[in-house]
């Protein structure tokens, strides 16, 4: 597939963009190529039977024109004309969106593909640098995000075009490295005989890690959620503190591996709901030291900046950038683009 084959014709404005997660669906309306997207009210997915109902609700009472196109990001694989969400009951049906909402075109992308689309536009208060030097212009970028799962995507610059490359990087192997790890890893439950990064580095993985730390320290496991652990760590609970220190160090290891895989001299970006709650632990030395400990390339890794994303919803901004100027990006839409004539 050539870059020319991925060129998207301009969308018919206004374009509705949306980031649909397991709990909330967040939307904005892009009016033209120049103006920022108009933020629309977020909609709890559980409050609506389907995406069409949620879109009607977010537009209701808003002084905006009706959308003519839609670009939506969902958590999960985009295959076929019926796209079930990973963590919600909705099944997104693009042809039903076209028929029910009067749209000309609908494009459905992966959620971390949308995160990658946001990276070239993040700056200022949207991000906080954690070590490294200046990002190189036109160099590859990578985004990794511990949330419900562990999302990952690269953003490659080639032929004057940004190319988002989503994948299943969250399932790479995560084994023990330090003596401390070797005490704890035997207590982490296996999935299919292995421990993938997502089994530890996610909102669901954090209690799993805390339980392993507790058992290794001959303590009773007593945390049931990521929120419990962060609150306990803030109160000085030793198991919770050690859990978050290990979590930060392991996230640094995985982020460093991803950086090496695409030579991400444009920076590695940390997204996801979990990272915002454990930012103090990411700022400490363990995260950055693990990120850089990639012999024989430690010097190279020391130069690569890491950015903690503070933007409340970068995926929507990334989709809006793509909707405004699709020719800036090479996004493969085969099997993911539906039009009114289909």
Language-model region placement:
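ATP-binding/phosphotransfer module of carbohydrate and carboxylate kinases, centering on a glycine-rich
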Residues: 1-61, 65, 183-342
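Short glycine-aspartate micro-motif
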Residues: 15-19, 69-71, 107, 133, ...
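Short beta-strand-loop/turn "lid" adjacent to the catalytic site in phosphate-handling enzymes
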Residues: 62-108, 113, 117-126, 143, ...
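Glycine-rich phosphate-binding loop of actin/hexokinase-like ATP-binding domains
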Residues: 126-197, 279-280, 287-292, 296-301
């Amino acid at each position: 597939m050539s870059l020319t084959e991925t060129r998207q014709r301009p969308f018919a404005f206004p374009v509705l963009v949306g980031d649909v997660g397991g709990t909330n669906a967040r939307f904005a309306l892009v009016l033209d190529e120049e103006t920022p997207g108009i933020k629309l009210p977020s909609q709890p997915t559980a409050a609506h039977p389907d995406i069409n109902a949620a879109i009607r609700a977010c537009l209701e009472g808003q002084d905006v024109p009706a959308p003519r196109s839609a670009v939506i990001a969902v958590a999960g694989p985009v295959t076929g004309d019926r796209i079930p969400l990973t963590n919600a009951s909705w099944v997104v049906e693009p042809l039903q969106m076209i028929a029910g909402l009067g749209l000309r075109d609908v494009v459905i992308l992966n959620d971390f593909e949308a995160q990658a689309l946001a990276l070239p536009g993040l700056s200022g208060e949207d991000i906080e640098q954690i070590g490294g030097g200046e990002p190189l212009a036109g160099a590859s970028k990578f985004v990794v995000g511990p949330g419900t799962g562990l999302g990952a995507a690269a953003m490659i610059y080639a032929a004057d075009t940004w190319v988002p490359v989503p994948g299943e990087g969250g399932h790479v192997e995560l084994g023990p490295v330090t003596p401390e790890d070797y005490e704890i890893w035997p207590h982490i439950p296996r999935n299919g005989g292995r421990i993938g990064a997502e089994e530890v580095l996610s909102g669901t993985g954090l209690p799993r890690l805390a339980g392993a730390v507790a058992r290794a320290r001959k303590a009773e496991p007593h945390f049931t959620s990521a929120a419990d652990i962060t609150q306990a760590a803030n109160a000085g609970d030793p198991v919770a503190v050690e859990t978050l220190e290990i979590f930060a160090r392991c996230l640094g290891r995985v982020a460093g591996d991803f950086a090496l895989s695409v030579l991400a001299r444009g920076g590695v970006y940390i997204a996801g709901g979990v990272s915002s709650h454990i930012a103090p632990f990411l700022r400490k030395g363990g995260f950055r030291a693990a990120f850089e400990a990639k012999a024989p390339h430690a010097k190279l890794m020391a130069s690569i900046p890491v950015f903690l994303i503070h933007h409340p919803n970068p995926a929507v901004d990334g989709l809006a950038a793509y909707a405004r100027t699709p020719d800036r990006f090479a996004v493969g839409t085969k099997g993911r683009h539906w039009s009114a004539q289909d």
